[in-house]
Amino acid sequence: MRNNDTCKADNGAGVSLPTIPTVDDAVGYFRGVTNGDDAIVFSSYYIGVADGVGAWNTRPQGHAALWSRLILHFWALETEQQVLRANSSSSDNEGSFISPLSALQASYETTTALTKSYSIVGTTTACLALLIPPATLLLTNVGDSQAFVFRPSEGKFIARTEEQWHWFDCPRQLGTNSPDTPVGVGQVVEVQMEEGDVVIVATDGLMDNLWEAEVVQDLTGWAEEGDAEGHMAERLVERAKKVAGDPWGLSPYMERAVEQGLGIEGGKWDDISVIVARCQRREGVE
């Protein structure tokens, strides 16, 4: 990652902030990948998605995609620092030093200060999964993106985060003018993992267009085939995209809209970002 410590901004309170890089530098600076207003980030022990709220793009200085990317970027940096400190500690209780929720709070505070110094507005959801050795997975969520753990031996989800809304189609979100904060509303789910378990994190474009049973069916077939994780993610995206583009299709989003008395039909056209990861034992580890 390119070091940008020599170029910083001041937020007026004497706090030195990292600067937003130029377009040419951005690819080398930010952790993760942007997909529309969504962003994703991944490593060998953590994965995460964020869904920038697109309505901000119609406002002056609104930038939904930047908010989602910054939240994941700073969360990844803080998480890596927590893991580094834990690994260098003499304590046997490694997990007590690692908190994806506190890392998200730190990211939220940094992103808020940085964007405010440039008068950039926006909000985003965030959904994260972090593996702490030997086999503890922490799922952390704010908003309507979701994380799931699928156990092939049982053919079902054994854990999941719940969607969070203020009201229909208005998720809890982090950023400009939102009362939500990670420590205030963040949801944490702890899972004891087994080898072969599959973790999925996805923005709402997936589960707004596919029912849980459809996703489980796809995952079951994929697990039996032994195919690559990337192929499963692509399969889920393509299936959700097909429903999203069908104005007469049946979808969970349509069902929820009808329950609210809204005459909405078909799928929900949206950015769709999915990460699929499999829990595997490292070589040489008992």
PLM features: what roles do these ranges have?
Residues 1-286:
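PP2C/PPM-type serine/threonine phosphatase catalytic domain
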